[in-house]
Structure formats: structure tokens, C-alpha cells
Amino acid sequence: FAAIEPAQVWARAHSAWARRLDLRDDPLAALPMTTDRKLLSGQVVVVGFGRIGRHIASVLDERHIHYIVADSNREVVEAVRRAGKPAVSGDASDPIVLVQAHITKAAMLVVTVPDTIASRQMVDIARKLNPHIETVLRADTEDAAELLRRDKLGEIFVGEQELARGMARHVSGRMAAQPG
């Protein structure tokens, strides 16, 4: 019996069929039927709800822009739902997860996880299901960003570059305000 759990973990990691089978019984893998339909069209799909995803969601909330969260961490999805926001649990590089996030009617896909291969898969799926979707991706290195840009996968952001731009903007603005 001790081998069952590791075998299940291995099967889910290596088989889309096993992941789909696992999702059938997971109530967090689909949006509740009570989800307001106006939230399911023209929305932003935010993949990953770590620090970056939460910050993006906060800005979207301030601007009253609808979004759906897709995250592989069940506890995160539960917390998002408790906060009254729509969220689905699962690996968003699996088409089922993006379908559950209503990617077919979404205006934008925002991928905050720094996984180049998974990001590419998510964009491919999203564009097949919704050819006019806009995509925004996070890259963890300039090399990864260059690969994503070369393949025209969307607007690409690298954390260190964005931080440097923000700091430089602040410094130059403060220094320009000083006399002399």
C-alpha cells in the first residue's frame, strides 16, 4: 500500500489521461455552476497565483476587470474562491484546465509561472481555442524571453529587467527634481 501514492503521483506527472481521470472527482477543477456568466466572457485568465499573480489580480480588482485564476495548488484555489473570485485547480498546460477557465471567451491569457515549455503549451492551447486572445508571459531569464519573443508568443516580461526599469525611473525622476 505504501507504493500506491508514489505511483499515482508518477502517473499524474507522466500521463495526461491520468491527470484528466484525477480531475473528474475534483470539485476545484471546474468553476461552480453558480459562477456569474458575465465573468466568463472578455475576462483575463491568470495562470499562477503566487506573488506576481496576486499583484496582477489586485490591480485588476482595482480597475474592475474580471479574471479567472488557474493554479495547480488546491489551497490557493480554495482561498481565491473564499475571496469570492472564480478559480480552477490544475496544470494550465493541460487543455482541460484552460477550457474550465473559459479561455475560449477570454480577452487575455496572463502566464505568471516562469516555465518556458509550459508557457509555450498554454499559449498554443489558448490560440487554438481562441485565435484572437492576447497573451502576456513571464520569463525567468533573458534567454527564455528571447525564445518566447522569437516564436511571437506574446508580450514577454523578465523580472530583473522590470525591476531595473522601475528603479531607474524612480532614481532619474528624483534626481531630475533636484536643483543643480
Where are these regions (language model features)?
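Cytosolic regulatory regions of ion transport systems
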Residues: 1-180
